[in-house]
């Protein structure tokens, strides 16, 4: 028998204290920079965009949306304008009409203030299946007046091929029934089509509230503080769309008025400050402007 008493209580080893589980760091919500900018602008400079548009409309007049071309023609014409003068792109498009006639009803392309050419004469859209199937050397020769033909001809055919493979034909009318951002996302899956090109098509063909930001829009917007001075074009595009979310019906007006102002008064060199109705908010005139 153990020398210990039978009634003695057995000793127990104290349990080690469990280590506290490390606290998980709360995931930081990802901030949308475009929305953040729009909210900041609304807080510190309320009505800046609306007041700017009102001031510009007082000298350039009201801007009414009107469809120019069918969406496939608009897309091809926009591709032809890339790194080329609008007047040269018009020559190339007219040459496409003549070389590949479709026999469809005529369209009228009236140039707006954002268009640097003379506008297209009335004419039917080209026969897109024939353009896609044309020998490459032949197509290069047809669109040569537009400039950069060896680069643009294969791009045109690849774009038309992609549309046909996705949709069964070359029509882009279905984009009018899609939500604006979904339609833009679809277009930007096509190689060589960015946000600006897609937004131009969707705004001018369907009046979708998507803001194309070209060099004139960007220059005016940065000078008056609508977008940050160092914003890259894609971010500036998103910031504009965030600002216009409260009044999307003014998107076309905003695009046209800012282009008009950038061409006529707020030029890159020697802007005409004495004629500018928004010079009181321009950092180019006064670096301390609000």
Where are these regions (language model features)?
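Catalytic cores of DNA base-excision repair glycosylases
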Residues: 35-290
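Polybasic, lysine-enriched low-complexity intrinsically disordered terminal tails
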Residues: 1-41, 288
């Amino acid at each position: 028998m153990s020398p210990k008493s039978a009634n003695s209580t057995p000793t127990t080893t104290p349990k080690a204290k469990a280590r506290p589980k490390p606290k998980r760091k709360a995931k930081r919500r990802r901030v949308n920079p475009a929305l953040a900018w729009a909210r900041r602008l609304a807080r510190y400079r309320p009505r800046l965009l609306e007041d700017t548009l009102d001031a510009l409309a007082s000298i350039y007049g009201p801007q009414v949306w009107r469809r120019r071309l069918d969406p496939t023609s608009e897309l091809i014409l926009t591709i032809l304008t890339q790194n080329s003068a609008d007047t040269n792109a018009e020559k190339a498009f007219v040459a496409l009409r003549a070389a590949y006639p479709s026999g469809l009803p005529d369209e009228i392309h009236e140039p707006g203030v954002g268009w640097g050419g003379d506008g297209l004469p009335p004419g039917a859209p080209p026969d897109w299946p024939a353009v896609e199937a044309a020998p490459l050397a032949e197509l290069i020769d047809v669109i040569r007046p537009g400039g950069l033909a060896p680069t643009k001809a294969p791009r045109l055919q690849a774009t038309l091929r992609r549309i046909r493979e996705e949709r069964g034909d070359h029509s882009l009318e279905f984009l009018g029934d899609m939500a604006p951002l979904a339609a833009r996302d679809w277009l930007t899956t096509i190689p060589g089509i960015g946000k600006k090109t897609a937004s131009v098509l969707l705004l001018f063909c369907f009046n979708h509230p998507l803001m194309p930001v070209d060099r004139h829009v960007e220059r005016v917007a940065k000078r008056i503080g609508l977008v940050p001075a160092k914003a890259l074009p894609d971010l500036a595009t998103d910031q504009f769309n965030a600002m216009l979310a409260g009044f999307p019906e003014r998107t076309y007006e905003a695009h046209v008025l800012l282009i008009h102002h950038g061409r006529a008064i707020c030029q890159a060199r020697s802007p005409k400050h004495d004629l500018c109705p928004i010079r009181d908010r321009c950092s180019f005139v006064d670096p301390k402007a609000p």
